[in-house]
Amino acid sequence: AGAAGERRTGQLLETVASRGPDVLHDLRVPLVDYPVNIDHAVVSGRRVFLIDSKLWRPGLYWALGGATRRGLRPTGRLASRNMHMARDKIAAYLRRRGLPARVQTPIVAVWSSRPDRPVRLAVAGTGLRVRRAGALTRILPRRPADPAITQALARLLYP
């Protein structure tokens, strides 16, 4: 199911790329001793947006700085530690290369597993931007990418 969400986000991000930014898919997180990947990265100017794709069952998901819940039940669906770590490691990786990139707050792009029933989101205090995936076309900037940043991130692509 998760791969389906990643594919849908990838297709959506291609429309974003047609407006100027560069989009990369399936990057490894550098400077860690175990395999961690980033589903998508968007480079717009010197800004880098890391995006994790999710495919969730319909319902209301909410959090106020603690555990994410679906309705009243806790759910482990929001892996914020990995996204925070990925942001920090990508920023350090680019800094070591002397690149003036600004790695933004990670985005979690959520799709409903049932197109006829929505996922509703009220998630705050997690240090992540949790959004319906369709909103990516509105919230991501449209500037052409800094090619040096894209080139450095391309070295992290999984084969």
Residue ranges and their predicted role:
Residues 50:
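Gly/Thr-rich phosphate-binding beta-strand-loop-beta motif of the actin/hexokinase/Hsp70
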